[in-house]
Amino acid sequence: MCIRDSEYTVSFLAYIMWDPVHMYNAVTNDWKDVEHQITFDVRQPKTHEYTLKRLRKFIEDHPYVNVLRFTTFFHQFTLVFDELAREKYVDWYGYSASVSPYILKQFEEEVGYPFRAEYIIDQGYYNNQYRVPSKEFQDFQAFQRREVAKIVKEMTEITHECGKKAMMFLGDHWIGTEPFMEEFKTLGIDAVVGSVGNGSTLRLISDIEGVKYTEGRLLPYFFPDVFNENGDPVKEAKYNWVTARRAILRKPIDRIGYGGYLKLALQFPEFLDYVEQVCNEFRTLYANVKGTTPYCVKKVAVLNCWGKMRAWGCHMVHHALYQKQNYSYAGIIESLSGAPFDVVFINFQDILDNPAILDDIDVIINVGDADTAHTGGEWWENPKIIEAIRGFVYNGGGIIGVGEPSGHQYQGHFFQLANVFGVEEETGFTLGYDKYNWDEHEHFILEDSEEVDFGEGKKNIYALPSATILVQKEKEVQMAVNEFGKGRAVYISGLPYSFENSRVLYRAVLWSTHSEDELNRWFSTNYNVDVHAYPKNNKYCVVNNTDEPQQTTIYRGDGSSFELALEPNQIIWYEIA
């Protein structure tokens, strides 16, 4: 029975009549009179059988091909256009295009409870990565991973049987493969290639385990939107390479390449010259760092609801695209992608299952808006989570919170770790309490910085009496530190990616772990210049991340130092004496 003046939604399955990737390419490249391709539902028995036969025939008809690049297996991430050919909704991690009556019937039989459309629709939010995932949606994801893995394994076995290698493109129809989950290791994939938009998306590829090699497709694509008389492909290529290089120096991919229409690139000889330069630089880099672990000053754990499943993709709506609402948080992940830390991603369930998971962690980072999957939402109502995190810090661990860490209104607090961070958010409930802690203080964390860019920042944050304020603007705290037991906490309202902010984060990690004395080890006094060391290979390098000459003092691992001048974008390799 409907109630008058109430809103209702109607849930339904819509058949995809035009494959979203084909539609995207047609719209982007202004294709005319091209037949619309449909998406194969390879999970259907007849289509499944046909696809395997078609794969064998393709291999037989193309004996000169020795690597098959699958694009991909088998479900497209959520990508919807409107009636005006404009992009309407996109979620690079979206599962809503991976459903069909056949699949849903299988799901019900396996999990033992009826499927409801709301498990996918999720009030219209479609379980995007900002939503705290429900048990039912996580069950569906796990089911999809298992079923996708079975068919992928069949296809890679055929590929190997025919003497070929199987490569997967990390993009387009990749939903269900989930490279950081256990099922991926069963796929039989030889290699993974993916698009590199920045350091985070580079690590999405290079951190994948269980393959023989990884490859990054650098930008720009050889498409008319860049390769035209008004475009500057060299400028875009330089920015892309320097951004990706930071991450490559921490965890290298094995190969690099480009994609698009080659005839367009041929019209820009200066671009070809720069690509040659990049290739030569990559060869030297790869020879020096492959097979070794770079020096890591600390082990950092990013804590959210997704853990390793969304490693390096936190706060990413579309592939490496800017969003005003999240760049102040995504900057943390981007900084970590090229920083000298051992970075892991854990979720709250990991802590419940094994509290000892925190024993070898130096610093926990919780970053994002309140009541999102990135900060935890209702997970903070679980006393075992509170006990584990508070105990970790109290006994000497470090914690860094960005935005609204542990933000969830519950039992008299908005920040559930307010006494740990030493800050709280004014939501109106505590307006009657006077606040007297507003004085700013100099601090180790800010010694390299002039004025910190907090991005969008946060309003209405105030300090508790125990906290030390580093930056406040109009009585709104932007950065503060706090001692909690033997441990230390750092609060930052936001930290967009920049070289200066990466230095702020680096110093915050050192301070939170009582490691200020470790600053001058494999260190550059100029935050535009990075130092990466590879003790196993007796190599280290100094990298200028800018288009301008830089002067700096370089500290080696033993604390000795030397002065250095670098040319724009230059990388210099040294032997460790």
Language-model regions, residue ranges each:
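Polysaccharide-binding and catalytic clefts of secreted carbohydrate-active enzymes
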Residues: R4-T186, L204, K290
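A short helix->loop->beta-strand "cap" motif at the edges of active sites that frequently abuts
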Residues: G163-K164, K212, N395-G398, G487
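Extracellular ligand-binding/catalytic regions of CAZymes and related secreted enzymes
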Residues: L79-D82, R86-Y89, K263-V297, S337, ...
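A glycine-rich, often tryptophan-bearing local segment used as a flexible ligand/cofactor-contacting loop or short
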Residues: G376-E451
